[in-house]
Amino acid sequence: MMKQYNKPDKIIIVTPGSIVLNIFLILVVVSHSYGTLVGLLSHADQTHKEAPCFDIESQFNGITRRIESGEDELQGAFIPEGCFLSNVFYGYSLVNISLSRPTDSSFRKIALKKLEHLLTKVEPYQNRVPFKYTDNSLPGGVIYQGNINRLRAGYIILGGSNSKIINDFHSGSKLLFLAFSEANPPFPESFGGLTWPVDGVCALDSLRLHDELFKTTYSQACDKWLAWMKSHLDPQTSLMIAQAGKDSDTIVDGTRGCAMSWSLALLPTIDKEFSRQQYQRFREQWFQPFGPGLLGINEWYQGKQRPTDFQAGPVFAGLGAAATGLGIAAAKTNADSE
């Protein structure tokens, strides 16, 4: 009969140096947590209102400094497409701020110059992980092509005249239209062999903008996409799914908080009524209070994690950082001021 081996008690060595180090680390965590908590509590019980110009300006300048110092590259440590999306979202902020200041010609000039630089910077990202492992029919995949094309649209809306960017918008829109029209299921892949239908919303919105600017009919690509999404809702939540299989009827991953927030931020421009229905259901099922006057959004239904092919940034107590952050945009575009 074999004898059970008892492991010896763990030996813990405590030195003055280790004590000092632990105290220092605790102070760092407490100081950063305090600043974050104070910032959150300052917004407790507030309904939607336009942010003060100085607040927008200070946040924008801070993000500008971080991107120019290379901090965008660090985001790739959290999600594979983090660096790309950091730059794209920064570009969207340039467009939005400029549109909110129609008489500020000096800022618009700055915005156009920064957008030209930004587009030049992110275009080579199609050759980086994870975008380089996609189908050659849509190089970089729909996340890459859709967001960069929408950024071109913003540049043109602001009055940009760079001929390369304008020509790229034409060719990129045609490429996306063909990709959606020929794909079965009716959405191109996001990464190599992987498809998340909601990732197509940015691409479809860029096609809508091309139609408005140049009188094309690329928005027809929305019809097949919408029909598939409406007929393949998650049976558990009656919300849009996150990931589909390669065939036309397989649901790989049901509703996800980050995917819903991402898509609902733009869905009103494609189908306002469908977006209203989806947002109302999403708000009722997925929004969770987590402090005095604060709301977060679950990453999974009822906060219970399921097996998945992809992560979506930090998740704490079921609440998703990406789902909650993107949910602010979803709330605004769906007229939720609470």
Pin down the residues of each PLM region.
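Well-ordered alpha-helical scaffold segments within catalytic/enzyme domains
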Residues: 38-43, 88-106, 147-162, 202-215, ...
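Extended ligand-binding groove/face enriched in aromatic
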Residues: 79-82, 86-88, 92-201
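Short, hydrophobic/aromatic alpha-helical segments in well-folded domains
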Residues: 172-175, 190, 206-209, 225, ...
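Low-complexity, Ser/Thr/Pro/Gly-enriched N-terminal "stalk/linker" regions
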Residues: 26-89, 93-96, 112-128, 163-174, ...
